[in-house]
Regions:
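Short aromatic/basic micro-patch
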Residues: 1, 37-39, 71, 93, ...
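Amphipathic terminal alpha-helices
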Residues: 127-143
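NAD(P)-dependent short-chain dehydrogenase/reductase
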Residues: 1-37, 43-44, 50-51
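A hydrophobic C-terminal alpha-helical subdomain
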Residues: 98-119, 124
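Mid/C-terminal beta-alpha module of Rossmann-like enzyme folds, strongest
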Residues: 55-100, 107, 143
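Amphipathic alpha-helical segments that line or abut small-molecule/effector binding pockets
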Residues: 43-54, 128, 132
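Substrate-binding strand-loop-helix patch
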Residues: 10-11, 35-46, 66-83, 133
Length: 143
């Protein structure tokens, strides 16, 4: 089992694509600053799985964590998305209670990746580097 967090890619609906769309449509966005975690680029998760699969042995059972390296709030993530996308949109930090959600979200959801790195020799890049690749791909394909 591989657990992940804050998953995004060039495809489907996700936070990166939503922030880019809203950043183009609005002059100001309010984004939660008191929930911290680590974004995970789906391409990096897929590459990690491909790296791990040949190393799986019969009877191996464990839970691993995978996300990109580094830590940020949703606000930090949104700012990076808007900046890397070259958009001029004001982003204001708000507290979780100011943005009602159907699901309760933990204030700290950073995953410890030491086990997956040790057991499978995985190197993981920083979330900002992965985000740059995703945004470059989105812009290259006019998404």
């Amino acid at each position: 089992i591989i657990r992940t967090s804050w998953l995004y890619s060039e495809y489907g609906s996700n936070f990166v694509k939503t922030m880019r769309r809203l950043g183009k449509e609005r002059g100001m966005l309010k984004v939660i600053f008191d929930q911290v975690g680590t974004p995970t680029y789906a391409g990096d998760l897929a590459a990690a799985i491909v790296h791990i699969l040949p190393q799986i042995r019969p009877g191996m059972k464990s839970i691993y964590h995978f996300s990109n390296e580094g830590v940020c709030s949703w606000y930090d993530f949104a700012r990076a998305i808007i900046e890397m996308s070259g958009l001029s949109c004001d982003i204001r930090p708000i507290e979780s209670w100011e943005y009602p959600s159907k699901a309760a979200r933990p204030p700290y959801s950073v995953l410890n990746k030491a086990k997956i790195k040790k057991d499978f020799g995985i190197r993981i890049r920083h979330w900002r580097d992965a985000l740059r690749e995703c945004i470059d791909n989105l812009e290259e394909n006019n998404l």
